[in-house]
Structure formats: C-alpha cells, structure tokens
C-alpha cells in the first residue's frame, strides 16, 4: 500500500489555516490530492475535512478531552493538570498538545516517523475498540501515536480526534479541489457526491476513471443520497401557478426527514444530515421490514412523534429519540413514532431518480403496505386552488406544518433546492439561522456565551449574512450546553465578542422583520427569541437571505391590508 508521511498532511493543515482565500485553499488541497497514492485516496479527503469517517458511517472514535489529555500525558511525561491549565490559557487543546510534545521527557529508541496509513489505522482500532477494557485500549493506541508525533503533528491529530479542525475547508472547496487535481468537471464531481455522499470514493473514481467514470456513478444501497430540497411559496395559489396545470400536494409533517435503505432484512435509516440513526429507532426498522414488500429499496419519509389522540408532537421529540443510545425500550413507550413515506429513489436494482414524481409515487404505493407505524404521506393531486386550500386548512387543523407542492413531472434532484418542490407554511414562521458569533456574559454568566449573532445563508456567495442577535429564550442549562458546543468553534474575536465557525443551526422566533442598515443583509429581526437547536439541519440548509426578503414582503403586504 502506498503511503505518505503524516507531517505532509500536518503541513497542509497549517497552510490552510494561514489563508482565508478559497482559491488558495482549493489549490493547496488539489496539489495534495495529486500526490496522494491511490490506496490513500478514499481516506485523505475525510482527513482533510478533519473527519475520520463519512457522516453516515456508524463508527466513531468515542474519545473525549479527558482521555486525550491522559494519552498525551502518558506519551510525554507532562502532568495532566499542566496540560489542562495550558488548555485554559490557549483555549485550544491542539495547541496545548503541541506544547506538551515540545516538553517530551524522553524519546523512544524505536520511534519512527508517523505515516498517514499508521495514523488512520490507529483511528480505526480506536473506533472498533469495544467492551470491557476498551477505554484502556483506546488510551494505549492514542499514546503510541503521540509518542512518535512531532508537536505540529500532535496538534492536528488531537483536533481530528475531537472533531475540532479549523482549516476552513468545507464540501465546496473539496469538490473544486478534486476537479482541479484530476482535471475533471466540477459538476460531475458534485453529481457523483450527491448520489453517494462519499468524497473518498468520488476522488478515487475521478483520478482513475475521469469524467467517464464520474458520469457512470450511480446510487448504492448503504450510501445515502443527498436530499432534494424545496423552496418556499407564499400561498397555495402561488404554488399551483408555479407548478402549471396540476400538482401533487402533500402534508408537510413537523418531524425529522429520513432516508431508508433496505437490502433484504438489513435496514439502515439515515437522518437529514445523513447520520445513521438505525439503532435508536428499532420499532421503525420492524415497521419497514413488515411494510416494504420489495427486496431492495431506498425510500424517503418524515418521522413524526405521535402524541395524545394521534396529534403530532414537535420535531424535537424525534431528535430526542435519535440521541438516545440506552434504555431505548423505555423511549419507545414515551415517544412513539410514525413514519410517513413520500418518495422512492431505488427499487430492486432500478434507480428511480430520473423517473417523474407521478410514477415514483405510483411505485411507492405499489411496494408499500401501510401499517400502524408506517403510512404513505397524505396526498392530493388537483388543478383546483379551492381543493388545495381546503387540504392546507385540514393539515394545519391536524397540527401539521403546512403543505408540500410537487410538480408531477419532476425528477429527483439530489442536493438541489429548486422550484419543482415548494413548501407552503403560515407567513410569520420561525426561521432556522446559523450562529456566527457570540458574546461572553457578565457577572455570574461571565464564563458563558450569551448573546448570539445569527445569520441567513446566501446560496450565491456561499456566505452567512447576519440578521440579528439572539439573547432571550435560553435557560441556564441551554447556555452551558451552547458554550460547550461553540467553544471549539471559536475562530477569532475581539474583546467580549467571539467569531464562531458557522456550524450550528438554531430555530428563532421574532416579532417582525425590519429593514436595517446595521447588517449588510439589509434586514434585522425585531425581538428575536431562541426556540430550539436544529441538529437535523446543516448550515447550508438554514433559511436563505432570499427567504427573509420574501417574508418581509409578505409582512408588509399583510400590514397594508389591515
């Protein structure tokens, strides 16, 4: 197997950290990919992103800050307390690991330079360590690589282990770098990634098979497809006009979107963010096995928490189920779930994403036998505004979010947010926004982050544009959790204000949207208030600046009618 020195990768991380220019980051990554041996190509793209495995891979390292500090102490002879104090001073565990490695008491006689292969194989051993004594084994594996690590290598190994890489490389840069490195079309790299969610696989195909190979990449059971997304419509009438003569209207459930992969008796369920949540919802797995008649299938649906009288409960209840790893039987009783299927993307060897929606729905009805916990999404196909309005009213009365409108001739476009699907919800709806900054509190809250700068997504520039500061709606427990979550994401700041890497999405309610010169978006939320953490959404799935402009227009029109 071809290999590379790990110091080459740590040097790449350092150079990526030193520039904010996307073009330069893309060039650095492309140059690195060019010299990566074929055998490492499926691994290196994830390491560049600061990950070990794809998001959909069930394996995780399961190493916290304390265990990592213990491993560094074992490797260097530096006391754990000294490393902990260093972390308080630097605010960066990676930097503190580098400082500890510089003070290493003795160097092993058998020490060898680290290679990417060795570091990655150690990560796999750590992830696969389980059962009695697993923590001790993880500690030993980590200490062994820290013993042979140079200070800068140790810094980035620590950041990778804790998921705290700060190089500013996201999916867009990696996509463009693969295209540049192997002289292939960026749109083909994008398509292949949208179909497989696997940059390692895509990079290898790009290098070995070029544009032809990328064009032949197809859906694979066990690798989630990026979900097709919807734009917003102001009303049922507007949606029907956009769709043409006739449209399919479906209830928009207030739940968590999931993608189900079935291969015989093997069922895997992925969340909207493509995380494997199968183990947390075994009763849903049983319902899928009982209801889906085809041997192999990929279907999509909305998982809803069911309350008294069958009414839906807020989506946060579903997320509580996803997070639960123990006492799952107890949670099945406390938070019963129902899966409402709305699409099918693959059946028994036949990909269906290029098949019109009308035919996909017919195929879904053909392969699904509804049960108590698994239903088909309620649907109305109509040309009449009045019928669709009545259906919308019924959806809201039942406690659902609104409606989805879908073009009957639309193909499934992975990862695309177009107008072939539209969502219709009450006008003054909450917004999903990204935290990009925060301020340290005062008095008894001086150690906690408090007021949060939130931003909408601008899909044209790929930037997050601020629209307000949210300081209310948080409990003390919330602030403790957010501080813990956001501290590793701090990338700069001045005084009490800190700049946060845009990773965390929150749901925000507000009194109204105002025009404002204060923010470059041109808008500001009046009296914004925190509602919930949106763990199911990636930053790019947050509400867009166009959506805020649209809501502002709705709001002003509504005021004018009064």
From Swiss-Prot:
Q: List, in alphabetical order, the Gene Ontology terms for molecular function in this entry.
A: ATP binding; DNA binding; DNA ligase (ATP) activity; metal ion binding
> Might you name a Gene Ontology BP term for this protein?
DNA biosynthetic process
Q: Where does ATP bind?
A: 250, 257, 272, 302, 342, 417, 423
Q: Which cofactor does it need?
A: Mg(2+); Zn(2+)
Q: Which residues form a coiled coil?
A: none
Among its keywords, does the record have Metal-binding?
yes
Pfam families in the cross-refs: DNA_ligase_A_C (PF04679), DNA_ligase_A_M (PF01068), DNA_ligase_A_N (PF04675)
Protein's UniProt keywords contain Manganese:
no
UniProt xrefs under Gene3D superfamilies: DNA ligase, ATP-dependent, N-terminal domain, DNA ligase/mRNA capping enzyme, Nucleic acid-binding proteins
What broad class of enzyme is this?
Answer: ligase
Q: What is its EC number?
A: 6.5.1.6
Temperature behavior of the protein's activity: Optimum temperature is 80 degrees Celsius.
Catalytic site: 252
Q: State the pH dependence.
A: Optimum pH is 7.5.
Keyword annotations for this protein?
A: ATP-binding, Cell cycle, Cell division, DNA damage, DNA recombination, DNA repair, DNA replication, Ligase, Magnesium, Metal-binding, NAD, Nucleotide-binding, Zinc
Tell me the HAMAP family matching this sequence: DNA_ligase
Q: Spell out the family assignment given in the record's similarity comment.
A: Belongs to the ATP-dependent DNA ligase family.
List the NCBIfam families hit by this protein, alphabetically: dnl1 (TIGR00574)
The record ties this protein, via PANTHER family, to: DNA LIGASE, DNA LIGASE 1/3 FAMILY MEMBER
Q: What is this protein called?
A: DNA ligase
Q: Which organism is it from?
A: Thermococcus onnurineus (strain NA1)
